[in-house]
Each structure stands twice: as C-alpha cells, then as structure tokens.
Amino acid sequence: MYFTECSGGAWASKWSDNLTWYVRTLVVGATRGWARGVLLWNLALDEQHGPHLGGCSDCRGVVTINSVTGDVTRNEEYYALAHASRFVRPRARRIASTSGIEGLESVAFRNADDGSKVLLVVNVAGAQRPMVVRAGDRSFPFVLPAGAVVTFRWN
C-alpha cells in the first residue's frame, strides 16, 4: 500500500502546525498503518502554485521555485519527508515501537543494508515531553519540545 497524492496549500498557512501534521499523519501515521511509502503531490510548484493543470488551484509544492530568480524554497512538506527519507533507506522494514507517553507518536524502522535502526518521534502535546529511547539493553533520555519532531538513527 502506498499513500499518494496528498498536498498542502494556501489554506494551511501555519508552518509549524503543518510540519507536525505531515509527520504525525503521513510519515508516522501512514507507515504505522503499513504504508510502504508516502508521496506528496506536487513536488515543485512556482509562487503562483503553478503550473496548474486542473484540480487544486492553491496547492503548495514540496518545494517552491521562484519563476523569476529560480530560487528554491523548501516548504514544510520537504522537511517532514526529510525526517524519513534521509535516514530510512530503500528496503527498510518497519519494526515494533511504542511510546506510552501521551502526546508522543512514533514509528521505527530497521535498514536492510546495514541493520541500523531509525526512530521518528513527533510531539503533538502542548508541552515538552521527556522520553527514554530503549533498544535492547541500551537506552538514552531525551526531552522533546512541544510540536517538535526528531529522528534518531543508531547501529
């Protein structure tokens, strides 16, 4: 199963809320529901939300390319996807993970190529949350600020 063709747009203008929503709903939520991948649509649009070929007239691209200067702006969708795509490699498998802490949502993966593990956590609570990451007989503490997203990778 692939989660495809979701897009942000001018209707969702609060950057931090958008980042949290994308990570919670798409990166963590879809993959916890066994989606093999998440695709946002459109990848690149200009500052006028174009080119426009029908459908959503004010969708936002993962990146915005200025039609005059060519400058590229990485949008919140880019950073949400980056939390996974930089660390979760092709052929990685989702592995069991739990948080047990109100407001923290997470998903974990094992990379097939090197056996490394990746844990993505988003804090949807209105306050910081202390947490302890445990893997086997090893652990470390971490405090995740309200609305924050973090990615851990270890061997």
What is the meaning of each model-derived region?
Residues M1-N155:
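Substrate-binding and catalytic surfaces of secreted/luminal carbohydrate-active proteins
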